[in-house]
């Protein structure tokens, strides 16, 4: 008699591993479990144990051998890996976490051998979740992976096996189903920043200081030589006051510089990949006396979504306040006229009031010139890049296959159907802009204030140490015309002051104006010795006007530069591929009719849009030039061709290629250009589809030259029973 024994075994295994590596540590764990149930028909027991698993075999003398088991199994694993690395400059740390889950349900059969067995079922599931984080000096990078896969196998087997050999009377059926999906999500963020700012206050240029010193020399020289050494105290006071004024000006208003830089890069990337596959397969293989049916179905889809954003910015701005602005020359002219007027109208023999007025006027002239028109420089830069990219890829495939292969005495049908869809959507936006503004005329050097101070001290030293009206000159070879005018003016002033101090009793002195610049002042009151000269009687006024005009021309140059440039680009791309196919194939013996049909169709569209705009503007001010440049672009092209049907009959403009040559028409498209001038917006819009393929389909034994409509952008391959093969490939411009 049969001995029925029920045995239940459960094995639980936990494994933990720890490992160390360079500058990091890792930990790995896994958990697994297994359970099996066996039925055996033998009095003797043979058991084996190896590596945590147990196996039991049953034998019944060789007459009958049956094995029934229930084998469910589950397993899981989780890993954690951390890496803190300081030795490498780019990476500060890295952490990775991975979690895997595995489940499996093993095949099982009933424990009673005398009864009809239940279907054997098997299945498995696997999941994987991963998260990675990386911290570096440039930012944080996060990425993750997630995948899951499952399968289920069902084998309904009803069979009675004996030694009598009647296998042909037993039907067999088998079905298998599987499905899987995969997802990948990745997100990356990168941020980088720096800042730059430049500020500086320049000092008067050497050229301006020379002009000012020459004019000051021509004014002070006659005062010193007018009354011998009687004005030494006033000159000393003037020297001390000017030094006292210039020293804090050099120290406090010296060149300063502050530097900082700001630039930003921001990148965000998101990607999603999805893959789904479902398949059902049913296979039946029997003897020739039994009909057989085979059905296979598969479904697959794949999706890819990618989103990327990139942003980069920088800014630049340069602004400078000109020392040679328009109102500065006016201030210089007005103050110089006041100084000369006071010197001219000074009472004879006493120039102390004139010196005091000169000191006040010089201070009044220099202070607004330095404070209001002092050189300042502020620098900043702005430029921006913005890029956004989005991509979506979708792939879907559905297929149904039915295969039957029997003997010649049985009809067979073979049907295959497939459906495929692929989508690619890509959106890209790129924006780039830059702006630059430069204002201010830089006529200053670093050592200009030192040169100004040294030259002024030399002049004052000569004024103080001059013996009784003789003052040595400071050689300035430049500006010969200015020197001659100043010397002429100084001669007029010296002659006027000397004659006013020595000849107070001259009653009526008429003034004359000649080319040599001789001055005979007219005194209204000879008793008090006061002198006055009207504007019409001043013989040196013309020379002074020439001096002021020359100084204004040299001193009043202004310049303003402004430049703005920008570029904006935006592109959008969409790719859609759809393929629907139905294939019916029957291949039997010669006694059975065979039919074959193949149909395939798929539109493919490629839409690309690009918009680009570039502009620049430049402005230069200061009385010289003003220039503005507008955007200029070219290349505007739009083509559209490639309709459904025979490409030999429908060819769009710009299509090059042989017509009706062979079984495949290929072509390309010419790109045109259009120059719209100096001010235009440019863009290109291309909508094109490539070449199609022709296929010959035949039934029976003779080939057919039937031309089926082929969709553009679709390639196919059809094999006919006669052995003739046609192929085609897509070509997209």
Swiss-Prot record:
Tissue: Detected in terminal tubule cells of the submandibular gland (at protein level). Expressed in submandibular salivary glands of 3-day-old males but not adults. Expression in adult submandibular glands is restricted to females. Isoform 5 is expressed in both 3-day-old and adult sublingual glands.
One cellular component term from this protein's GO annotations in UniProt: extracellular region
Taxon lineage: Eukaryota, Metazoa, Chordata, Craniata, Vertebrata
This protein's name: Submandibular gland protein C
Compositionally skewed regions (Basic and acidic residues) per UniProt: 538-552
Glycosylation sites: 57, 141, 187, 327, 447, 514, 528, 611, 686, 696
Gene name, Swiss-Prot/TrEMBL: Muc19
Entry annotated with the keyword Signal: yes
Region of interest: Disordered: 48-91, 172-204, 249-330, 369-450, 496-733
Processing and modification events after translation: N-glycosylated.
Listed Low complexity bias regions: 256-270, 376-390, 563-574, 609-619, 677-701
Ranges of Polar residues composition bias in the record: 62-84, 186-199, 300-318, 420-438, 496-516, 525-535, 722-733
Span of the signal peptide: 1-20
Subcellular location: Secreted
Keywords: Glycoprotein, Secreted, Signal
Main location group: secreted
Biased composition, class Gly residues, residue ranges: 654-665
Segments traversing the membrane: none
